[in-house]
């Protein structure tokens, strides 16, 4: 997540983080 070691992880993390951020 915070440690971008892969494009896939970054994409998924960004997506989930967006939902989490909007959810607050």
Curated annotation (Swiss-Prot):
UniProt keywords, alphabetically: Allergen
Protein's organism: Olea europaea
Entry keyword Plastid:
no
Q: Which family does it belong to?
A: Belongs to the glycosyl hydrolase 17 family.
**Record's comment on post-translational modification:** The N-terminus is blocked.
Q: What is this protein called?
A: Major pollen allergen Ole e 4
Any stretches that span the bilayer, and where are they? none
